[in-house]
From Swiss-Prot:
Keywords: Isopeptide bond, Metal-binding, Nucleus, Phosphoprotein, Repeat, Ubl conjugation, Zinc, Zinc-finger. Residues 441-457, 465-475, 503-515 have a biased composition (Basic and acidic residues). It comes from Homo sapiens (Human). Residues 493-502 have a biased composition (Basic residues). Component of a nucleolar TRAMP-like complex, an ATP-dependent exosome regulatory complex consisting of a helicase (MTREX), an oligadenylate polymerase (TENT4B or TENT4A), and a substrate specific RNA-binding factor (ZCCHC7 or ZCCHC8). Several TRAMP-like complexes exist with specific compositions and are associated with nuclear, or nucleolar RNA exosomes. Residues 479-491 have a biased composition (Polar residues). One of its GO terms (biological process) is nuclear polyadenylation-dependent snoRNA catabolic process. It is found in: Nucleus, Nucleolus. This is Zinc finger CCHC domain-containing protein 7.
Amino acid sequence: MMFGGYETIEAYEDDLYRDESSSELSVDSEVEFQLYSQIHYAQDLDDVIREEEHEEKNSGNSESSSSKPNQKKLIVLSDSEVIQLSDGSEVITLSDEDSIYRCKGKNVRVQAQENAHGLSSSLQSNELVDKKCKSDIEKPKSEERSGVIREVMIIEVSSSEEEESTISEGDNVESWMLLGCEVDDKDDDILLNLVGCENSVTEGEDGINWSISDKDIEAQIANNRTPGRWTQRYYSANKNIICRNCDKRGHLSKNCPLPRKVRRCFLCSRRGHLLYSCPAPLCEYCPVPKMLDHSCLFRHSWDKQCDRCHMLGHYTDACTEIWRQYHLTTKPGPPKKPKTPSRPSALAYCYHCAQKGHYGHECPEREVYDPSPVSPFICYYDDKYEIQEREKRLKQKIKVLKKNGVIPEPSKLPYIKAANENPHHDIRKGRASWKSNRWPQENKETQKEMKNKNRNWEKHRKADRHREVDEDFPRGPKTYSSPGSFKTQKPSKPFHRSSHYHTSREDKSPKEGKRGKQKKKERCWEDDDNDNLFLIKQRKKKS
């Protein structure tokens, strides 16, 4: 009662899916598989049938048995026809071993009628059986095909009969025709199943015709990529990828829908031209752009030998080995050395002459292609001392370039730029910064030295003045200090004055008049201290 009154699950499935054939007999599916595996694709069946009829007539009338009831018929399979198997004496046996099968047709008269139009349409869409079955099958007349349904019987060939059949049919049988076998290299061609090829393009040695289908020509199938970009992809885009063209995440630059950017020149960083058409290329001997008025300050190095790689054409500081020695370094500091030194491989090929046994920098014909070759190997790795020495040499070269005006100096008025950027900029600070940046930083030390020299010179000058005063007045000058000012008073002069002290008022300049007033004030201070009566009387007379 498990299957609703059915004895087995097979009977239940037959009733469920309305399968008329018994599910116990698994021969139906196997026969169908065998039939479809032996089908050949045919073109122009009318011409093929005519050729077969002509061959059969020439072979003789003894083999023809068109009037007999057990006559062999051409099996034609189409979508409209139905293949029926007899329930009587037909026996189908299959073998596990690889064997050649024979197909035999058996006529059974059935009360069925087919019109001529259905027959003609079925013939055009039919498919033929294997070539080895065609040799044993004869062509029936068109009148007899209308009321005949074929039966197919597959019989296993014994080992003794198999040897005989392979002798006669071995020429036409290929390995791919056998069930369970794969395509062998010994097969004649790949179009063994194709029959009736008239529109041949080329004809090979064996007379094999190659044809092109009209449908393929109309479809214009080609293995070419479309010129447009693939904007939609069949897999999920990686969100971590950044496009170099539009700087957005999710796609690569080759799949970017936007137009590509114009490439920059890596010499002048400008767009619109590349390296070879750059208006300001670098000098071959100094790392400075080559202008119209460029005069190289360094010596030519085309005939100089590098002390590092021992190659001609460059100096030691310009050797490519300096940056190639960092191929294992991932942290700042001296380059990391490999544990085992690398050796050149035995298979060496030249990129100039394409010969085996040497590299491009060792090529005897390199003067034609590359007059200044470079070694691809690393001779030795630098240490800290060598790196520091190289940096010192580079700094000296930079100083030479600055003195000659090759490297542009900073702007003379940097506070103007700062004021434009900062609207609340202080002018005093700007002036101070302008004074500090008025001269290059290299001359700051010289400025300090000049200031110190000026100060020392002023000190020596004052000391010399005091010495002259001491020689003229051995008793020493008398100094008077006024509040808020610190001035050195001149020494008092003796009573007897020489003639050169007396000058006329007309000859005195306005500056000398000011000095005279100061002298009178000093004399007043001196008279208060002196008790000489003679001097007091003399002053009264002058006043």
